[in-house]
Amino acid sequence: MLYTRLLRHNSQFTKFSGTSPNLGSKPLFSKGNLYTSLLVTTLYGTGLACLYLESNSLNKSKEQEDPHAIAEDDIVNIVHDAPNRIFKPALDTYQEKELDLQKSDLHKVLHSLTYSDVSQFSIVWGFLIQLSSLIGNSTLGKKSILYKGSVVSVLGFPPLIYMALKLRMKQLEKAGVRFE
């Protein structure tokens, strides 16, 4: 009833006006938004895949271990021989171990990563990128100080994580752990 009254009183109303496309409107998704969404989805997927690999590697190591109690001296060996590390140690000879001591910090940090490290890094970085994109596409716009700050946080996150992982690696090396 109300609908028919609106039809009678509104002379500008035409049939199917709600479904006809407005050709002058701007598309909702630009290429930048598409690439940002693709990057965020990829980072989230990487994080979930690494969580799955972490779970599988730890479950396999628990099945292979003896159920003996762990002594305090064994803790360093467990960290050193962690089954969830991405790059497994493959050094056998003394010369290769000497070459390992001469490698850069970046190489050592990458070889000390576990699946959980990569998972946490990728999920948090994806969240920061998604948040930055959301702020840029909102009413605040890309010229706002909040958007510029979020872009700085997105770009500054990987170096910050590298420094934190490097500090962790140095502390573990002081405790006697060698990263091969």
Swiss-Prot record:
It is found in: Mitochondrion membrane. Induction: By cell wall perturbation. The chain crosses the membrane at residues 34-54, 121-141, 145-165. It is a multi-pass membrane protein. GO terms for cellular component: mitochondrial membrane; mitochondrion. Its main location: mitochondrion. Coiled coil: none annotated. Keywords: Membrane, Mitochondrion, Transmembrane, Transmembrane helix. This is Mitochondrial membrane protein FMP33. It comes from Saccharomyces cerevisiae (strain ATCC 204508 / S288c) (Baker's yeast). The gene is FMP33.
